[in-house]
């Protein structure tokens, strides 16, 4: 399966039990910041934004004072899982990022999608990739 198929079929899909509820944007990005696959709506990000995200995975709490920035959008960092998941909130939407051995799985959402639904979609694919050694 191509990386693009993972984004299209497992991240940008209808959320279980809620037709027409899906993430706003999603991507799989290597730890080096190279995009493996992304939705058409995923924001163009700056290298320093990706560096900040990677630093937060290695030093949990790094982004808390400044917020998480992606594509020029600032998210308030909320409770995640140290070294494994970063979650952010902005207005009625937010972001979930799951770290795997080689990649970061991104999901961005707006209402009516809930934070829990975004977490489920992103973390399910991330956990699968971890199990596959990715």
Swiss-Prot record:
Motif Involved in PIP2 interaction boundaries: 84-100
Q: Which residues carry this modification: Phosphothreonine?
A: 114
The terms under GO molecular function for this entry are: actin monomer binding
SS bond list: 13-118
Query: What is the annotated signal peptide range for this record?
Result: none
Annotated function = Binds to actin and affects the structure of the cytoskeleton. At high concentrations, profilin prevents the polymerization of actin, whereas it enhances it at low concentrations. By binding to PIP2, it inhibits the formation of IP3 and DG.
Instruction: Please give the name of this protein.
Output: Profilin-1
Gene source species: Olea europaea
């Amino acid at each position: 399966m191509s990386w693009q198929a993972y984004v299209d079929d497992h991240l940008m899909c209808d959320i279980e039990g809620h037709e027409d509820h899906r993430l706003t944007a999603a991507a799989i990005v290597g730890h080096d910041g190279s995009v493996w696959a992304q939705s058409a709506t995923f924001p163009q990000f700056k290298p320093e934004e990706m560096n900040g995200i990677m630093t937060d995975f290695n030093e949990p709490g790094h982004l808390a004072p400044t917020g998480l920035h992606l594509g020029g959008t600032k998210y308030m960092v909320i409770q995640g899982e140290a070294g494994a998941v970063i979650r952010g909130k902005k207005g009625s939407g937010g972001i979930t990022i799951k770290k795997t051995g080689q990649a970061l799985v991104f999901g961005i959402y707006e209402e009516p999608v809930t934070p829990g639904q975004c977490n489920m979609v992103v973390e399910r694919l991330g956990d699968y990739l971890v199990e596959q050694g990715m």
